[in-house]
Swiss-Prot record:
Its cofactor is Mg(2+). Keywords: Magnesium, Metal-binding, Transferase. This is Isoprenyl transferase. The gene is uppS. GO terms for molecular function: ditrans,polycis-undecaprenyl-diphosphate synthase [(2E,6E)-farnesyl-diphosphate specific] activity; magnesium ion binding; manganese ion binding.
Amino acid sequence: MLERFSKWRQAFTDTEDEEPTSIDPQNIPRHVAIIMDGNGRWAKEKGLPRIAGHREGMKTVNKIVRAANTLNIEILTLYAFSTENWKRPKAEVEFLLKLPERYLKSELPTLIEENVQVRLMGSKDGLPSYTLHAVDEAIEKTKHNTGLILNFALNYGSRFELTSAMQQIAKKVQQGELMPEHITEETISAHLMSNHLRDPDLLIRTSGELRLSNFMLWQIAYSEFLFMDVYWPNFTEHHFYKAVLTYQNRGRRYGGV
């Protein structure tokens, strides 16, 4: 890991004015979650249709996946499509749901080569067959990879997730499989869509907006939040590395002193 980190640091300092002299390879956030925001405003400011922003944003995904893998981050969760996104214009929704297929068709060989494991967090209900096929194929072909977990939050909403978890738990109580007094935080976590993942250490939201948009509300209770005033299509590896540096300069207390 240290050798890999040293190579990254040299590449970084060769291309950027600011040297990350204080970054600690032993204190890398294990799980980074990102709300990829600002595609539409990026396009509007350039006089382009919103889908042009989403297309450009897909290029940013490539950069950040590589950056996360280089830093040996264990999990990268990307908020790709929320349950609220269905309310957008039909043409935009159709384009957004084609992006996973386009991305995976183009990048799956590289993801396999770089030992990345693809996972999905969200409801499959309502997703088009071409999206499901692309995601399922990627999950199957990368399931034995042991490097970065690339977790796509697709058709995901935290309130829906929590409601579903409560329904599952209530059913177990009703059937006598679980006593109400035995329900713990761990019980709830085990019934969430993210039950196969540790909670995020760092949550990044781009575009400067200061809200969580129904994203992993249970899981980010003790995450460090970083709201960055840059649209997602303009978000670079440099921004990502600066986010990691900011995380390392904070003291995580988990509710303590």
